[in-house]
Amino acid sequence: MASVKSFKRKYLKLRKSFDSVVLETEEIEQKIAEISEVYRRILLENAHLNDLLIDMNSTVLPTPPASPPGSPYWEAKPVSHTVFLESPSDVFTLEKPIASTHRWLSKLTALSKSTNSTLSTPKSFHSPLQSRGISPSSAQSSAAVSSSRKQKRKRTSEGPSERRARKK
């Protein structure tokens, strides 16, 4: 009889652990289903936003359609190609109307034309040290000073006469 009781105990213990694992698995599968649904929505929104950007870009400089044939945003007629402008500042001097569906874009481009002077000027290279106000030469000299301090510390602690006596 003792072996039957131990078998029942082991069986019940395994049954509890199995049930808990089954519940965890069901919860994980439910989370995966929710995440895949969100993933599909994000893919659709991303495709829609890409097509909006391409549409906006085609009003300034026409580009070929990026959507593959068969997608809901694919256009049957290709966009005509034009010769690209020499400098990027010429893009902002063009006065082409943006589609009426993109009113916020027309406001944004008008604002960027009037207020953003950096669009026409070339960006120069800045090192991270310069953005903090540190010149590269002073950074190298401070590194040399700190390494010489370490060497001095090592030299002073080497001699037995310079060691401190322990308090008892």
UniProtKB/Swiss-Prot annotation:
Biased composition (Polar residues): 115-129
One GO-annotated biological process of the protein: DNA repair
Low complexity bias: start-end ranges: 130-148
Bias-annotated ranges (Basic and acidic residues): 156-168
Region listing for Disordered, in residue ranges: 115-168
Main localization category: nucleus
GO cellular component terms attached to this protein's record: Ino80 complex; nucleus
Alphabetized GO MF terms: DNA binding
Keyword DNA repair: yes
Protein purpose: Component of the INO80 complex which remodels chromatin by shifting nucleosomes and is involved in DNA repair.
Protein name (database record): INO80 complex subunit 3
Gene name for this UniProt entry: iec3
